[in-house]
Amino acid sequence: IKEDKAEFDKWVDELEKIDRACLTEDQKLTYDVLDEYFDVAAGVYDNVYLYEPFSPMRGLQANIASMFTDYRFDDKGDVERYIELLGQIPEYFQEYLDFEKEKSEKGYFMSDEVCQKVIDQCQTFIENKDDHFMVTVFNDNMDRLDFLTDEEKTEFKEQNKEAVQNSLIPAFENIITVFTDLKGTGKNRMGICNYEGGKEYYEYLLKTYAGTSKSADEVIDMLDNELKNLMTDIYQVYFMNKDAYEYFASNYDDIFAATNEMSASDMIDRMMEDASENYPDIGTIHYQAEPLDKSLETIMDDVLAYYMAPAIDDPDNNLIRYNGMHTDGMWTTLAHEGYPGHMLQNAYYMSTDPEPVRTLMSFLGYKEGWAMYACYDSLYYYQYEEESYGDTIADLYKLNDEMSYLVMGRIDLGINYEGWSLDETKQYLTEQGMDAGSADELYYTLVGDPAVYQSYSTGYYELKELRDYAEEKLGDAFDVKEFNTIILETGPCQYDILKKQIDKKLQGNVI
């Protein structure tokens, strides 16, 4: 950690040496993005013991499967490096397990409920040791490679199996052993704010994952106001078109039934054709939409789909994976991951030839905010069975989905910033007319991964706020395609910087 901090400080010093006034406009944008990025990122060092490398949703053990099963093999060297990386996992995990032991000694180890989630994840991962998915998926990948001889494929399959059996699985068994020993040493069963410095650390997480410059209190006010607006909008839709409302309520599970007969590519291609009027023309986006390997469907049961961006030097290799166990009503999922969501955003931004350093930063608030915004737009291009109710169905589906993510974001703030107990969380769900039976699972999910949903909830509402701002500013002159183009051209960044770009490009009239 000390080495990381020294490296971090070095890069901050390098940036401060640059005279911003001497830069081009694009370089100034990159400078501003980096400057704010470093300012926020410094928060991780305020209390390093609040960092959690094994959290159930974002942790090392939770993401190994997709990291390795989607590993790109472009040449023989890639295969060799893959197997080498597998062999390094025990040592890599051990460094963080030593950190967990130190966290425990300092009183910062996770709660028993979260600890058990991690143990259960690892136990699931090592099931079927003799026929492990990391062996079967790798073997299938090898069979598809045309640059290897049959002898090389056989040799690599043996090397991989040995690495899985002797390195990867023992590394996960080691997590189970260490976490079983440490279980019970946690001092806090509630949100991160109950640790010393926890509220400040949550502010860092919020800014990191949502891309917001707002304080946690300001985000609470924003989400509370948006919830009131959602309730008002739902009532208005009900009173303006009761028949459509009742149709939606009665047919909710079958709204997208027609997509069950369509392939993933069929749906994405249709959205590319029908929704393109609202987005800048980028030409043909080459992609593949493929199901998860059967062996991964259960292990990644909570994953509907995900987008894998291509390498910088191979822009046509966009990949969307979807879970074959959850193919019902995939329209919005594929809009989120594909077009006009993540895939369009990444493809368009990379087509602008951005500064390389900007491609290294994630900005999940921007990316997930855009994907949410884009998938809601796709609702208005779907051909519903009851065509006369189309716009109302789209409105209601959007409002219903918005409310789910908003409530999760608000509860996260309640637990991890305001210190809500489990009972207070149940009370909040009940007050919103939602099932409090899911409160236990939701509570410990958010305790285990503070701010994990903020890139979706706060990230989306930050983008919505910018859209409302631009519409108010331009009135009848507002053009949705122009607005979307500015968002995509600017690329992943913090929302306050994105607003400055909107002001600059929409005739410079700052409100």
Name these PLM-found stretches.
Residues I1-I511:
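N-terminal maturation segment of proteins
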